[in-house]
Amino acid sequence: MLRRVRAFVIRDFQLAISYRMEFFMRVLSILIVVTTLYFISRIFEGFTESRFTQWQNPLAAWLTGLAMLNYFMTGFSSLATAIRQEQMQGTLESVLLTPINVPTVIISSSAWDYVQATFYSSLYLFFGWLFFDVRYRGSVLLALSFLILTTLVLACLGILSASFAMVFKRGDPFGVLLGAGSALFSGVFFPTQLLDSGFGKISKILPPTYGIDGIRRVLIEGQGLNQVREPMITLLIFLAVLLPFSLWVFGRAVRRAKREGSLIQY
């Protein structure tokens, strides 16, 4: 399995390095965003509302939110994007007709996207620390566990999205809604406590809400495992339900596409 994953990563890396200007422009754009948020955050200096302890340093809250959102959305969209690219290049059939099991296909197709997401998401936190003295505290391992859990949950939704793309030969419209909903209602740009009861209910059904809240509790508030147990258990419940269901749906989508001979259609 590791050999196959490495082969996919090498292939995608070779493709990525052929667009070096895109890499430098993306790094520059992240630095510009971080700098802009720093100057905006100075408007809120001295903000001490007790309900919003995570937002007493708005720059730290924004940077953790954006970094995590970038990573989470990679988990959701990477597999569906990979499936569509393979379809348009006419290589999906050769990939899926090889004796590779479904989990290996899923991991291999998404591996390079996660490598990129890890690098770019880290830049938000790194630039904040290097240039604007943003300090993080708490257990890095605990924050990492929230990152992995939330990414796995969104990867399950991404598997469902990829199943849709494989069967219907088009992008999943629910992906746009999930991305916009996560950005608006998961606490990336403002505290979820500001949402009214209707939008608050939307926030509570979005996995990134619990992931971002857990990571901020750890990195910004310095909370430990006992204090962040509730959002972690919620993410585990999401994962326990979505993982077997998404793998089952993807397996059925692959079998249907093979049976109908539609793997090379797009």
Where on the chain are the PLM-derived regions?
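Hydrophobic transmembrane alpha-helices and immediately adjacent juxtamembrane helices
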Residues: 1-266
